Amino acid sequence: MYIQIQQKAEHHKMNKKKVDVVIPVYHPGSEFKKLMERLERQTYEVNRIFLMHTTDGQSLESMKERYKNVTVEEITPDEFDHAATRDKGIRQSDADIVICMTQDACPDNEYLVSELVQALEEANVAVAYARQLPRKESTLLEKIYETI
């Protein structure tokens, strides 16, 4: 598996597409920090991360200082809409591929972006997705729901 991934990584260097990430953010917790750290460690570099922050009294300015590729877009709670907020972030991007994520869905490994990009290289594929794994502390019901 490692050799196959390495070969695919070499292919990506030749035909590398620009990838941006859009994340709606509201009252970010510890999972959000973990998400940002894991996005930084992806084998396929993320060009820009658009944080669509619903104003909640917290500042995300430290994210712009910590991560050079972060843009914070402040929106009011009245402006927030699940689809429209993501669309607003997507429209700011000039990337070939935009990945929409949630603030509490952390990549399980460093290959998430690479695998999504690879799936989109197929001529007959227009959309790719990854599933969110339940956390270790999730209840049995949450674990069942998350794996459906």
Where do the model's predicted regions map?
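Conserved donor NDP-sugar-binding/catalytic core segment of glycosyltransferases
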Residues: E110-E142
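Glycine-rich, basic loop-to-helix element that forms the pyrophosphate-binding segment
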Residues: T76-S93
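Catalytic metal- and UDP-sugar-binding loop of GT-A-like glycosyltransferases, i.e.
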Residues: I75, M101-Q103
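Cell-envelope/extracellular polymer assembly enzymes that use nucleotide-activated donors
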Residues: K18-D20, R48
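Short beta-strand/loop segment that forms part of the nucleotide-sugar
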Residues: V46-D56, E73-I75
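A conserved acidic beta->alpha catalytic loop
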Residues: M52-E61, A105-C106
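Short, well-formed alpha-helical segments that are part of the catalytic scaffolds
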Residues: P28-R41
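Short aromatic/hydrophobic "clamp" motif used to bind/position activated sugar donors
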Residues: V98
